[in-house]
């Protein structure tokens, strides 16, 4: 069986890991970082870029740069880029494709399977949307697991003694808290709670708003309407937040933030940790209720917790750590890397599914975060499965008709904790018809809820009198039909093919540029060791390739232009062979006294041939 990678698909940053040699390994991306910004951008030429390169160009391309798309998963939100609309699943799939490609580059093999994590408080629609994103990216999602559970799995690898822990997970866009029992090879989630609209992005937004207000007071200019200035302020706010985790004050200096009739304006402000805490106090306070709810649902007092684990980059904020200590009475543990532990846990689960012995025999028992109900007479939400029920789970209940001679029933499936169906999230509706006419209350209709290990819901309704049955896998919330997903898969494959063509163009141009440089250097050093005719032939081929390199733009090179450059490169290599041979002989004859050209010819190991990328490159 092939490798199953573990992916933490985050709001602001994502991470990928894999079990290798019996241990989880975090895979660095092509830029050398162990986490990848969950950012996608489209350039003016229509090229797609993902991760750090996309984040770097956001200031000058704010309209076509997409971030924090995870907050829209499972909704009908669309991103408009030029004439095309993208679903959150499609944008997320682009991030997943990047992570998949990085994993393939590291492992040297194709990857087709993954375990992907989601916030514990994600509803069914959001989980299904995440699976759809994986499918679009070319991944068979073997399991969806909750982020706090994945963190506990990473922690449980090295902690066998029995204990109850709290995982406090404050990420870029979501907040989760889970109470988990670890012991005897079992990781059991006792309760979970959270807030899907609370995370580091909200802290950044508060600071950005403060910057805007302060600048308006000082200069009379509203920067909120200037997209480029706003993006610079957001990036500065994020940077300031991070710096204030270790420093008590930071300076924000943004020259030429805007211009008025008076001339250019500069932004210069000192922000203290005390002011930051004041701006974000209510956000930190919002984490208290989910913590209290999770403890109550688990039937535990804070003193019964053995440890509190911090997960997510936002837990580095000192005020957050202080709040955790206040709520639990425990000094929070920092034994896990908050940016990587979720991906590590996902890779452990992937290793288990792939049969990797290094993943151990840990049994994972997770829960559904929200109650599942159907709408009954009067709009009541009648619960079949309570929140914090261990999954997978199956529950059936008998219902009947509400009116005489009723021949059909509409089943409205809802998720949430409110008493009335309309106040909860509707996951989908379906109809069971063909019920024989009878007095109300006589027909026996069995409704069954079945939640799989991914937390995804299947619902069926059966008329026990006739045996007629209808069932539905809840997918309505993701707003993508099977045909939509198939289309997105094809488009994602096209993007992947375009990326490969573009990389081939970049590599070919860089390779050709390197050969031009080495040939020019060789011509200047060879002197009269080769004939004038040989030099002329080399110079003709050199000038032809040099001209192609000068005109080439890898972003828009056609396949024909790439092939022409490859052919010109081969021609120059062949004609310059004698040139490099003479230099090699000269170097040997000089017994190392002259310049070291060993291996400089086309047969030498250090010649910049097809597999060598020139060091002087432009990041793309």
Curated annotation (Swiss-Prot):
Taxonomic source organism: Lachnoclostridium phytofermentans (strain ATCC 700394 / DSM 18823 / ISDg)
Annotated keywords: ATP-binding, Chaperone, Nucleotide-binding, Phosphoprotein, Stress response
CDD domains to which the protein is assigned, alphabetical: ASKHA_NBD_HSP70_DnaK-like
Residue numbers carrying Phosphothreonine: 174
Entry similarity comment: Belongs to the heat shock protein 70 family.
Role according to the record: Acts as a chaperone.
Gene: dnaK
Matching PROSITE patterns: HSP70_1 (PS00297), HSP70_2 (PS00329), HSP70_3 (PS01036)
Presence of keyword Amino-acid biosynthesis: no
GO MF, one annotated term: unfolded protein binding
InterPro entries registered for this protein in UniProt: ATPase_NBD, Chaperone_DnaK, Heat_shock_70_CS, HSP70_C_sf, HSP70_peptide-bd_sf, Hsp_70_fam
Induction context: By stress conditions e.g. heat shock.
Pfam family, one: HSP70
Protein name in UniProt: Chaperone protein DnaK
Keyword presence, Nucleotide-binding: yes
Region (Disordered): 590-620
């Amino acid at each position: 069986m092939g490798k199953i990678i573990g992916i933490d698909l985050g709001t602001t940053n994502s991470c990928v890991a894999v079990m290798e040699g019996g241990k989880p390994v975090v895979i660095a991306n092509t830029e050398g970082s162990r986490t990848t910004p969950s950012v996608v951008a489209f350039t003016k030429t229509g090229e797609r870029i993902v991760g750090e390169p996309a984040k770097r160009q956001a200031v000058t391309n704010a309209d076509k740069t997409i971030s924090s798309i995870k907050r829209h998963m499972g909704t009908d939100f669309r991103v408009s880029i030029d004439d095309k609309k993208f679903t959150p699943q499609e944008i997320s799939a682009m991030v997943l494709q990047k992570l998949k490609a990085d994993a393939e580059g590291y492992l040297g093999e194709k990857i087709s399977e993954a375990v992907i994590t989601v916030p514990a408080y994600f509803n069914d629609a959001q989980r299904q949307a995440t699976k759809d994103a994986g499918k679009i990216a070319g991944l068979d999602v073997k399991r969806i697991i909750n982020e706090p559970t994945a963190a506990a799995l990473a922690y449980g690898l090295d902690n066998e003694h029995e204990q109850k822990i709290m995982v406090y997970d404050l990420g870029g866009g979501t907040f989760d808290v889970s109470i988990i029992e670890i012991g005897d090879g079992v990781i059991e989630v006792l309760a979970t709670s959270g807030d899907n609209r609370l995370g580091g992005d909200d802290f950044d937004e508060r600071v950005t708003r403060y910057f805007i207000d302060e600048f308006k007071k000082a200069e009379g200019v509203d920067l909120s309407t200037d997209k480029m200035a706003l993006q610079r302020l957001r990036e500065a706010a994020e940077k300031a937040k991070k710096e204030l985790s270790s420093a008590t004050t930071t300076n924000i200096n943004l020259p030429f933030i805007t211009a008025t009739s008076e001339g250019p304006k500069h932004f210069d402000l000192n922000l203290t940790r005390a002011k930051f805490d004041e701006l974000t106090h209510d956000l930190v306070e919002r984490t208290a209720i989910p913590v209290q709810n999770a403890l109550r649902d688990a039937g535990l007092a804070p003193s019964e917790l053995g440890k509190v684990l911090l997960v997510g980059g936002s837990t580095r904020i000192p005020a957050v750590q202080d709040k955790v200590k206040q709520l639990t009475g425990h000094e929070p543990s920092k034994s896990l890397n908050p940016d990587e532990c979720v991906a590590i846990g996902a890779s452990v689960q992937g290793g288990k599914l792939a049969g990797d012995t290094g993943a151990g025999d840990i049994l994972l028992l997770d829960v559904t975060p929200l109650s599942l109900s159907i709408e009954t007479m009067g709009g009541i939400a009648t619960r079949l499965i309570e929140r914090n029920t261990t999954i997978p789970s199956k529950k059936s209940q008998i219902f009947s008709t509400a009116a005489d001679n009723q021949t059909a029933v509409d089943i409205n499936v809802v998720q949430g904790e409110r008493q009335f169906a309309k106040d909860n999230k509707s996951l989908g509706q379906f109809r069971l018809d063909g019920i024989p006419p009878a007095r109300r209350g006589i027909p026996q209709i069995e409704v069954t809820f079945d939640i799989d290990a991914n937390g995804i819901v299947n619902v069926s309704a059966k008329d026990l009198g006739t045996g007629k049955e209808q069932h539905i896998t809840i997918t309505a919330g993701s707003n993508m039909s099977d045909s939509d997903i198939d289309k997105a898969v094809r488009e994602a494959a096209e993007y992947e093919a375009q990326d490969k063509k573009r990389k081939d163009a970049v590599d070919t141009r860089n390779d050709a540029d390197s050969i031009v440089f080495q040939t020019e250097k060789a011509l200047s050093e060879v002197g009269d060791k080769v004939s004038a005719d040989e030099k002329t032939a080399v110079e003709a081929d050199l000038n032809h390739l040099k001209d192609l390199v000068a005109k080439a733009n890898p972003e828009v090179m056609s396949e024909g232009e790439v092939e022409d450059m490859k052919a010109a490169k081969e021609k120059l290599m062949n004609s310059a062979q004698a040139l490099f041979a003479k230099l090699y002989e000269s170097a040997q004859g000089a017994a190392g006294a002259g310049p070291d050209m060993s291996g400089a010819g086309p047969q030498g190991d250090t010649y910049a041939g097809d597999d060598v990328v020139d060091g002087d490159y432009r990041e793309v």
